[in-house]
Amino acid sequence: MVKTLRPQNYNEAIYVGHFFRTGMPVVMDLNGLTDDEAKQFVDFAAGLVFGRGGDMDRLSPKVFLLMPHGRGNRVPTVEEAP
């Protein structure tokens, strides 16, 4: 199961952290945010993923997959795709 979140403001970052820390992959759809707000979320998510030993992949310009450590395979990047 993957949790998809479409935050409306930075106060909702707590939900990204909550689901990720419980071991659930999280898709962050940041299309509803300004570029500055989206950057804050990406910075938060990068720290979260680094600290917990997971992976973060960009699915589109403002959509990211956060994969907890030990939860399956990464999504191949454009460079890695066949």
Task: Identify the meaning behind each predicted range.
Residues M1-T34, D43-P82:
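Positively charged, small/polar-rich N-terminal and surface patches that mediate targeting and assembly
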